[in-house]
């Protein structure tokens, strides 16, 4: 990086969002004394730097990578972004939708089709500039550095050589990501921070760096950690100390060389946590249960001709049902003729019952008329109570309970209720959703050690830090935010720090606006 002082076309702070993908709640706070470079970023070299610590930040449902990321950088629940899950069935097109493609543009295309604005759109509309590194969501960004097949191939070869596992090496991924941000990959110099400064003589106002290594390392820690059955907190603290903290040192030096460090506000963020897998459930567990009475897709049967579609799962398993009388996917399946037989077959599977925590069943307000009032999006199905009955129609009806009763089954009950109501659209919602016990995952890869996407605090609550030398003119002092926050709040926070009016219609809010009345003085 060239030495000197860089600036954008106007004065103001430079926001760098460091997204530590999959980092659990309070990992940094609990180990900060062992992280000298994080200490400098958060507290400053003398320990007197302004910061705001938000220890309890709720993710959106599902707490899975791309839907959570999309919601975080749009400020909208999945229902409004169109990215409702990692994989889902579209009842109108009969297609299974996934988010991975060679061009890495599927999320951007979904947002464009739905006229959904991103953080980078709002920044651009305000006359400011933005860049991203490693992020798949790039809609509205002026510059973006992405990865490709060569990058991931190298990462996997390196890990196979070092650790004997054909998965991407997390340290390599994060090191190369920071390289990409600061100076670019071989073909991406012009889109890196150094290249933008050299060719455009400015520094972007918003820069996002997505560091995926924590998530990868949580999925596949080294063999010594697995052999001693390390907890997920131990695994993440180890990775933070040995890999991320040295990277932060490189970042600090790079920004100081460019002459912009004193203007920077860092937002240290995460979009989901991680849990150690306790039980592996074969991902195709439901297929033999339903195949006898329901037509499932196959090489000889298309999705449109099937009458049940089972999604790949993690901590949940989703089942889509067709109305077998009309033969139409957009017609609500009949409760007694379509939904009940599927539920009965699922509950007859002993592996399902040993892992099941809760089951919810979709409602269709104003569309289905079978003698029950349908006024919500879901019922909680009392599967244990139903099992104790004769299993007849009246017992099935009685087992359909208000979704609000989900609060009796989960520590985060109210949050989960809201999340379920704000996840799907009419075209993408499944009819049956199984929710597993903590640590129980539909997972065919027995080498995978950790996972996410569950409805438990370890996955659903993360922590944010807002800090850096550029913060004190806006928010002086050191604060711990006492109320709950949301990953949806990232967009309102960034626009606030840049002096951009709050975009209308967001689902998130700005916890920084009244920080004095909602925080205590920090004591780290």
Where are the regions that the model predicts?
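Active-site-proximal cap/lid insertion segments
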Residues: 164, 199-201, 211-260, 278, ...
């Amino acid at each position: 990086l060239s030495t000197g002082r860089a600036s954008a076309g106007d004065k103001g702070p430079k926001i760098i969002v460091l997204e530590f993908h999959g980092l659990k709640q309070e990992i940094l706070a609990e180990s900060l004394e062992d992280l000298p470079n994080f200490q400098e970023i958060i507290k400053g070299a003398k320990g007197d730097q302004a910061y705001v610590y938000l220890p309890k930040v709720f993710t959106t449902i599902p707490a899975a990578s791309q839907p959570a990321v999309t919601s975080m950088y749009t400020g909208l629940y999945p229902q409004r972004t169109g990215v409702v899950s990692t994989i889902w069935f579209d009842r109108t097109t009969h297609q299974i939708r996934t988010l991975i493609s060679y061009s890495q543009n599927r999320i951007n295309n979904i947002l464009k089709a739905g006229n959904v604005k991103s953080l980078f759109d709002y920044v651009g509309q305000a006359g400011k500039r933005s860049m991203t590194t490693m992020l798949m969501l790039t809609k509205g960004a002026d510059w973006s550095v992405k990865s490709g097949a060569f990058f991931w191939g190298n990462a996997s070869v390196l890990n196979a050589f070092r650790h004997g596992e054909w998965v991407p090496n997390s340290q390599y991924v994060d090191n190369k990501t920071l390289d990409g941000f600061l100076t670019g990959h071989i073909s991406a110099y012009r889109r890196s921070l150094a290249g933008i400064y050299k060719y455009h003589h400015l520094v972007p106002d918003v820069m996002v760096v997505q560091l995926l290594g924590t998530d990868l390392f949580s999925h596949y820690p080294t063999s010594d950690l697995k052999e001693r059955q390390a907890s997920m907190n131990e695994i993440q603290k180890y990775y933070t100390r040995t890999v991320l903290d040295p990277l932060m040192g490189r970042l600090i030096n790079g920004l100081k060389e460019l002459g912009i460090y004193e203007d920077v506000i860092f937002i240290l963020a995460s979009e989901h946590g991680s849990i150690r897998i306790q039980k592996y459930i074969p991902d195709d567990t439901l297929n033999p249960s339903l195949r006898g009475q329901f037509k499932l897709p196959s090489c000889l049967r298309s999705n449109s001709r099937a009458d049940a579609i089972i999604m790949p799962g993690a901590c949940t398993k989703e089942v889509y049902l067709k109305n077998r009388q009309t033969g139409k996917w957009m017609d609500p399946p009949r409760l007694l003729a379509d939904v009940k037989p599927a539920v009965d077959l699922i509950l007859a599977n002993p592996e399902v019952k040993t892992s099941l925590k809760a089951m919810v069943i979709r409602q269709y307000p104003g569309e289905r008329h079978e003698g029950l009032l349908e006024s919500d999006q879901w019922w909680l199905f009392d599967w244990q109570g139903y099992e104790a009955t004769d299993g007849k129609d009246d017992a099935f009806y009685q087992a359909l309970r208000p979704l609000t009763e989900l609060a009796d089954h989960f520590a985060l009950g109210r949050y989960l209720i809201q999340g379920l109501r704000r996840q799907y659209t009419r075209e993408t919602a499944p009819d049956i959703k199984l929710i597993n016990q903590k640590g129980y995952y539909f997972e065919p890869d027995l080498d995978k050690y950790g996972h996410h996407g569950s409805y438990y605090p370890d996955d659903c609550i993360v922590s944010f830090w807002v800090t850096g030398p550029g913060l004190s003119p806006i928010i002086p002092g050191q604060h711990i935010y006492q109320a709950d926050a949301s990953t949806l709040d990232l967009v309102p926070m960034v626009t606030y720090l840049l002096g951009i009016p709050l975009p209308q219609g967001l689902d998130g809010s700005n916890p920084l606006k009244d920080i004095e009345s909602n925080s205590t003085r920090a004591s780290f």
